[in-house]
Amino acid sequence: MTDDNSDDKIEDELQTFFTSDKDGNTHAYNPKSPPTQKSSASSVNWNSANPDDMVVDYETDPAVVTGENISLSLQGVEVFDHEKSSSDFTSKQVLDMHKDSICQSPALVGTEKPKYLQHSCHSLEAVEVQSVEPSLPFVWKPNDNLNCTGYSDALELNQTFDMTVDKVNCTFISHHAIRKSQSFHTAGSLPPTGRRSGNTSSLSYSTWTSSHSDKMHARETTYDRESFENPQVTPSEAQDTTYTAFSDVVMQSEVFVSDIGNQCPCSSGKVTSEYTDGSQQRLVGEKETQALTPVSDGMEVPNDSALQEFFCLSHDESNSEPHSQSSYRHKEMGQNLRETVSYCLVDDERPLMVPAFDKSEAQVLNPEHKVTETEDTQMVTKGKDSGTQNHTSELILSSPPGQKVGSSFGLTWDANDMVISTDNTMCMSTPVLEPTKVTFSVSPIEATEKCKKVEKGNRGLKNISNSKEAPVNLCKPSLGKSTTKTNTPIGCKVRKTEIISYPRPNFRNVKAKVMSRPVLQSKDAALSKVTPRPQLTSASSPSSAISRQPTVLSRTPRSDLNADKKAEILINKTHKQQFNKLITSQAVHVTTHSKNASHRVPRTTSAVKSNQEDVDKASSSNSACETGSVSALFQKIKGILPVKMESAECLEMTYVPNIDRISPEKKGEKENGTSMEKQELKQEIMNETFEYGSLFLGSASKTTTTSGRNISKPDSCGLRQIAAPKAKVGPPVSCLRRNSDNRNPSADRAVSPQRIRRVSSSGKPTSLKTAQSSWVNLPRPLPKSKASLKSPALRRTGSTPSIASTHSELSTYSNNSGNATVIKYEEKPPKPAFQNGSSGSFYLKPLVSRAHVHLLKTPPKGPSRKNLFTALNAVEKSRQKNPRSLCIQTQTAPDVLPPEKTLELTQYKTKCENQSGFILQLKQLLACGNTKSEALTVVIQHLLSEREEALKQHKTLSQELVNLRGELVTASTTCEKLEEARNELQTAYEAFVQQHQAEKTERENRLKEFYTREYEKLRDTYIEEAEKYKMQLQEQFDNLNAAHETSKLEIEASHSEKVELLKKAYEASLSEIKKGHEMEKKSLEDLLSEKQESLEKQISDLKSENDALNEKLKSEEQKRRAREKANLKNPQIMYLEQELESLKAVLEIKNEKLHQQDIKLMKMEKLVDNNTALVDKLKRFQQENEELKARMDKHMAISRQLSTEQAVLQESLEKESKVNKRLSMENEELLWKLHNGDLCSPKRSPTSSAIPFQSPRNSGSFPSPSISPR
């Protein structure tokens, strides 16, 4: 699956990682490479258009019939408010896993997706756990460091996917950590002004696995960086929770874990949470905008019974304000279970209370299922985050043998367009016994601050449309800025719809133009597979799809399990047929649902149609895949989104129905299933009122073209809204239900507008209204591009004046004014049929949509957004109630539909089709009329405002003119006075200047005379002093010369004496050394001669001995020869004798050699002894020589020193002589100058007389002789 991001084109972060299959083959994957589908080949695609966009396509189709398509999607949608320094970071990951009976390799997959809500550094972390059974070992460890532009804060994105596979277990762990400081800004697409980041992420996963004992292990690890400061519990408490669910039969479970920091609007900026029960130590978010509540849900179905779910009970506070997202999602899951099991014990001993990550939620499991839970609390402080929570949930389930499930899930959403389209492209011909599916979904919902005191008129959800005001202030309830509606038809087996509402985009640059939405076609064949599958059997088709303006939830019976991918090819052809089926199913399904439920197969398909609104950037309409059979995923995801009700009323309303669902509603609804459905529809109509602008309708009308029809047909159907029923609205709704128990769906439709008006008139239209911009008519096959909603066809651009008009409209809504014409969409919640048959399938009844659009409510404002979420909550409430009522119906009426009913169904279908056509035309007309009226109102308002401003300006300017005239008169008078004063001052100034000049000339003359007299006096004194100084200097010079000569003579004498003494000492020492050396030489010569004589004597002795021995040898030889002659007769004896003689000769030679060597050794020893003695003497003499040399060096140094001193003295003498000569010359010159000066001094002018005294040499030369040379 390839996701294209047309708008946000940022450099892709290329990452290559390796995967190895069971054979040990290692494959390198390039993130840029498109996904490939080949037999016995695995492909992983990492496509990142943005630093936050992370898409991984992991497809494996080994030789064994085992295929995996894993796409991990991370989406961050952020809105920033710089005033409050708060940002909401929402992200969603949905991962669907289906086990197929072909493959037998169980897998453990942990996917961890953090979400951060950042205000005063609180982090939101959502963790998603996925259980899959891949056939290949998969290791993926990318580290992405994302620098956010516009902020110093860095987004540190660490992802670690670690998959270890053997034939029994596979482990897939995704660790994604995003660290944020006070303001988080996604790179490339989030301006600091608060515009949502255009990050796009895609998620795709498919797998075929099956075995007799397939087990799924889901381990979840959550790091909660936000410490919860609770009045009842120690803040920043980390938890490590492990959930383990066992199922011997088909188990359909959904694990949704999100940990969201709830932020209190108090000035302290801390998260405030309350515990409903201090002993349970579970944290209930005390916030008007409920953050996502982490929940781990498991669902099991016995072989004989329908699917059963273990759900979380939401513990309400006394005021019922805090409501958890899990309560919404678990209502539907828990309805059927509550019907059968009110108190289930885990391990057959105790009810399992599963802490949903510091939320007060309990999971109750059927005693058939075993759940083990362990908690490990550890504290980690990172950055400003005070605590870290580690949550580990482990889900183990096994599927029955022979079960085959095909599922492909494609999820694409654009942060700007808020669109998620999903693909479900797998059909299997082999019949499926029971669907086994685990869906892990994390909806990108931001936790928002809770405001205990809501501003007047703003009790609903506040939608932020202005880019400069992206996040809502703390005191104001701020919605999840991005809620994602994901459309995920899941495989052949189950289609689930998750409705997620996104915040409204900015309308700064919106132009008032209605643009038709072009047909969006999927680029990939896999994308085309996403399109809602045609229902092959008409009998089950009525409930095949549920179309709604904001979201179309279609639940198709599992009759087309045998259909191949051929059915997918028929999808485009059968859109119209599906649309008709959707319409007919809405009308007929209420009465005939219980009968049809028995025929339906467990498969439920969800087609999500996101309606186009007049939002500049079409607000997100995303449907998350959920198993329709369980419809728990509906409830959970619905709970996720609508949980963001900011007003306390909305919170109370959400909790009250939750409590009712758990126990009291069971009794009343079992009696009359269809009446309960009608009541729920009516209550939903009461609580679910969507306000759609004309643009929304206009876009919907234009989408009905060619393939666009396929997309827009469901739009005419009811809006799927997340049920967040209001407690205050509840009583009138119940009354209406009583009145309408016996009514048909058409009667319900007729009554619903009245209810809506009643509710709006009661003062709560704002809570019931929903933002038009939050929903967009979006086809399911939108995965073609992440930014597909950005296309002008998808978005309805609104003019800026319309925004201005909406402010007034918002104020009117906030003031609870229900007088304006209101056209609202109401829909009947889908009602899952709980069948007791072996198939055990849920069937969600398609929603009946009602178009009630408020004419003037086009621009996306806070109240409209509030209305959106309240309507969503109301829808979810109805849905949560519907599954139970449907379950009651299925329990009471599991009989097969008779042929008469089928005929009625067909008739109703045709009627519904006709009516839907009329409705679409009316909607189009209303949209056009609304656009025109809105344009007129906007223009009129704009003109009136300009006229008022012009009148005000005219008044102010006239008053200013009067004031300026008076000021001008006063200024003219003052100016004349100033002119007169200036003239007077001018005359006075001139007189003063003349007087000053006269005084100046007089003073100059007096001063000249004075200074000339003083100059002459000083000159005379100076001449006298100069003569005195000259005489003194001459005397000093003579004295210095005499002293210098005497000292010079003394130094020379002493130096000559020292040199002579040194010479004498040197000669004496040298003679002594020579004498000693000669004596030692003579002694050594005497020793040498003596040794030579002794050696000669030894040599002579040895020679004499040698001669004697030779003679003996000769005599012996003669004897031997004689013997030989005698023994010639015996040759052997002769031979032996010869040998003996040769041996003797050899011995003699050797003896001689040994003797010679001994002699040499003796000589050598003697020489060594002598040498040692000589060496000692040499060393002693060398030492003495060295000492003498040292003495000589000293003497030479002294002599050199003396010579240098002598040279210095000579130089000094020369200098002194030169100085003396210079001084004598200067004295002569001075005498001559003085003599000449005396002759002409009385007659010289002041200028000429100063010349003799300016000689520069006089001052510098006089003191120089005083320096002595020494």
Swiss-Prot record:
GO molecular function: microtubule binding
Phosphothreonine, modified sites: 186
Any coiled-coil regions, as ranges: 940-1231
Ranges of biased composition (kind: Low complexity): 39-50, 200-211, 538-547
Subcellular location: Mitochondrion; Golgi apparatus; Cell membrane; Nucleus
Biased composition regions of type Acidic residues, renumbered to the chain: 1-14
Compositional bias (Polar residues): 386-396, 701-710, 759-776, 797-816, 1244-1270
Alphabetized InterPro entries for the sequence: MTUS1/CCDC69
Region (Disordered) location: 1-50, 183-217, 374-402, 524-558, 592-622, 701-816, 1237-1270
Highest taxon in the source lineage: Eukaryota
Gene Ontology CC terms: Golgi apparatus; mitochondrion; nucleus; plasma membrane
The entry's keywords: Cell cycle, Cell membrane, Coiled coil, Golgi apparatus, Membrane, Mitochondrion, Nucleus, Phosphoprotein
UniProt record similarity statement: Belongs to the MTUS1 family.
Alphabetical list of PANTHER family matching this protein: MICROTUBULE-ASSOCIATED TUMOR SUPPRESSOR 1, TOUCAN, ISOFORM A
Function: Cooperates with AGTR2 to inhibit ERK2 activation and cell proliferation. May be required for AGTR2 cell surface expression. Together with PTPN6, induces UBE2V2 expression upon angiotensin-II stimulation.
Name assigned to this protein: Microtubule-associated tumor suppressor 1 homolog
